[in-house]
């Protein structure tokens, strides 16, 4: 069976963010995590290596995942309905996921976000090109969506997580020599929410 077009945008790459995860462990005593849209599962593996009970959900059934975490990953396509994930966790992590799922399927994945006390997500702004980007939106839009599902946006925690983020790398423009962060999704568009 071939992979549906709307899945697999991760290209077998996990965008790790040890800085943000360490901050959540240190400041909020996070002991468990769910990564929604985990791709190959790198953040699940990183969290597990730090002693967290870690899980992931991703729709791509073609990815070869590390044997150490494969039993912690649920293969699920949110276009088919809610997942069967049934645990409560301290942190729900979701990087480069929201913009890939049609708005009409929000109820399906928000049930899993509601399993966390804290949420860290990234979003793609309006007009951001990418594989199956079908719900690129503003920060305000996502704050309203999470509020509707029982979360409060935490501006202070968002600032701290963006500062703590180690995702991405510094690159230089070949023409101007100007340095910039590349693939720094959390620094640019990370948002933090607390369950009410």
Locations of the language-model features?
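Conserved N-terminal segment of class I S-adenosyl-L-methionine
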Residues: 1-95, 104-114, 129, 135-141, ...
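A short His-aromatic
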Residues: 100-101
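Conserved beta-strand signature within the Rossmann-like core of class I S-adenosyl-L-methionine
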Residues: 116-127
């Amino acid at each position: 069976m071939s992979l549906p077009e709307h899945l697999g945008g991760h290209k077998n790459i996990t965008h790790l963010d040890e800085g943000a995860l360490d901050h959540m462990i240190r400041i909020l005593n996070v002991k468990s995590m769910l990564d929604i849209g985990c791709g190959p599962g790198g953040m699940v593996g990183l969290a597990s290596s730090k002693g967290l009970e870690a899980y992931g959900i991703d729709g791509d059934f073609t990815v070869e995942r590390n044997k150490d975490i494969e039993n912690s990953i649920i293969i699920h396509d949110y276009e088919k309905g809610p997942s069967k994930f049934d645990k409560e966790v301290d942190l729900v992590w979701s990087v480069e996921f929201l913009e890939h799922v049609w708005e009409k399927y929000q109820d399906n994945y928000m049930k899993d976000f509601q399993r966390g006390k804290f949420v860290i997500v990234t979003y793609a702004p309006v007009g951001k090109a990418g594989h199956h980007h079908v719900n690129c939106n503003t920060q305000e839009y996502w704050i309203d969506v999470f509020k509707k599902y029982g979360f409060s946006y935490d501006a202070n925690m968002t600032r701290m997580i963006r500062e703590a983020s180690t995702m991405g790398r510094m690159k230089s423009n070949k023409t101007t020599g100007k340095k910039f962060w590349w693939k720094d999704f959390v620094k640019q568009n990370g948002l933090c929410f607390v369950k009410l």
